[in-house]
Structures are given as structure tokens and as C-alpha cells.
């Protein structure tokens, strides 16, 4: 993966009014981040760190979904389900999320 980190994990200002999660977790709109530890993990961040949220503002994508057309920093629409409510990884605090689809909403610059 030849992508450079986009920032410190905070959502881009222009995305803040566009990110959200369904009450039942069936969809998430968020900014994509990539954690390189443990063979690589994709995070979908849908709330800023400053906002109180039951999942800490992020979900951790379970392996198996095709992310080849997406980049770190993109805004994406993700459909699926939370499959493990507790912390999914020792590196991040969000729950594990099984995505059935990930669609690009906006490409990072």
C-alpha cells in the first residue's frame, strides 16, 4: 500500500456534516483510515473525538471486503452490521463491523 497517512485520525472539516451511523448500525458514512499494525486494518470514522458516542466514533472493518478502489481519507458509505460490540483491536477502540458493501462518496484530495 503506497498511501501516505492523511492526518492524525480526525475527520476532515468538510466531512463533519456528512458523517453518521444508523441507530441499528446497518450503515455508516465516514472517513476511511488505515492502521498498518497486525497486517492492516481499515477504520471508518463517523464522529469527531470530541463527540460522545457509544462506539467512540468509529468502527473497525472485518477483513474480507474489497477496499481496492478506496483510499485512506476517502468519505465512504458502508452497509453491514456490528458483529462484536467490544473493542475490535488493541490499536483502536471501535467495534468490529462486517461490511456487505463499501461505496465511495467523496475522494480525498
Language-model region placement:
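Conserved RNA-binding domains used in RNP assembly and mRNA/RNA metabolism
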Residues: 1-109
Amino acid at each position: 500500500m503506497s498511501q501516505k497517512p492523511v492526518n492524525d485520525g480526525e475527520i476532515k472539516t468538510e466531512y463533519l456534516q456528512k458523517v453518521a451511523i444508523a441507530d441499528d448500525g446497518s450503515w455508516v458514512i465516514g472517513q476511511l483510515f488505515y492502521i498498518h499494525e497486525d497486517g492492516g486494518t481499515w477504520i471508518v470514522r463517523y464522529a469527531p473525538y470530541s463527540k460522545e458516542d457509544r462506539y467512540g466514533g468509529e468502527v473497525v472493518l472485518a477483513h474480507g471486503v474489497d477496499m481496492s478502489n478506496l483510499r485512506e481519507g476517502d468519505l465512504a458509505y458502508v452497509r453491514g452490521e456490528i458483529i462484536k460490540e467490544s473493542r475490535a483491536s488493541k490499536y483502536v477502540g471501535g467495534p468490529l463491523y462486517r461490511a456487505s458493501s463499501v461505496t465511495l462518496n467523496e475522494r480525498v484530495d
